[in-house]
């Protein structure tokens, strides 16, 4: 093979590699991301050591609401408008390249939708006057929260480990624009694979 052929092959391979990298970044910014769960706020649903989940990013882009009970990734910085740059820097691919972990992204369960009246009565969360049956929580909450009505364009989220979770009780209702996406699959550890 002559030098011209070797150069042509190398350029072709380089183009292929760049295309794969760009496609991976595109997918991880706009369609699907994976997240490591490494805090206790969603116990017992997710173990804080080594659980990995896949998140579908697009279901809420066009103003669609999550369902009550969905497990979502939210940006906890509720006092600022999210930008496309945030979506890019929140990508796990970019996080690995930049060697940083985004502490602002939380995994939580949707408890309330716009217009829902939430309150804490006798150790239980009530939504629109009815106590929630929450067989997924680790234990009853030690402390209550102020009654609230979830405003339009927002959701109310809480961790399943209520006594060790920072959530809407601390930052308030989360704007829909701060909802990254919905958890669709736990894919690791392999003995706990589960679709959501």
Report the location of each language-model feature.
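Extended hydrophobic leader/signal-anchor segments used for secretion and membrane insertion
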Residues: 1-196
